[in-house]
Amino acid sequence: IIEELRCESNKGFKLIPPFEIVISRNKVVVDLGTLTDAYEKEITIHTTATSKDGEKTILAGKDVTIIDTVKLDGLKKGTKYQLKGWQMLKEENAELIINNKRVENDYTFVADAEAMKVEIAYTFNASALGGKSLVTFEELYDLSNPEEPVKVAEHKDIDDDGQTVLITERI
C-alpha cells in the first residue's frame, strides 16, 4: 500500500488517496508515472455585523442583538461544519465579557452548497457599553471527525469596518 503523509511541502494540497500495488514477478520495475496533489480549495469567510434592523449603530440597553451575516465560500458539500463567533471590544482589542462569560455563539450546519450564507445572533446586556465599538470574530471548524474538529478558516480583523458595530449611549 502506498500512502502519502501530510507534511510541510504538501500543505494546502489534497492528499493522494492510498492505493495498493501487487508485484508478482522478481526484477520488475513498475513506473507509477508522476503522482501529483490537487490544490485544496481554500475556504473564505466574509462577514457583516449589524443590528437587527441592518444598522451599524445600536442604542445601549439591556437586550441588544447583533446579527452577524457570514458568507462562506469553498465549502465541501455534505460536510458538517461549526461556525463559532464572539464579540471583541475594538479599543481594548479584548474579548467582551459580561457576567464573567464571553459573549459568544455558534452555528452547526451541513454544507448543501460550496458557497453559503449563514447568520449568528448575539444577544446581551449592553447597558454599560455606550460609546464602545464591538467587532465580531469567527472561526469555522470541519466536524467530519466530531472527536477532533479541524479549524479550516477564521476571520479575526479588529479593524474591519464590516465586522464592527458602534453601541451609542442613551441621551
Q: Which residue stretches match the model-derived regions?
A:
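Solvent-exposed loop/turn and edge beta-strand elements of beta-rich ligand-binding domains
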Residues: 1-171
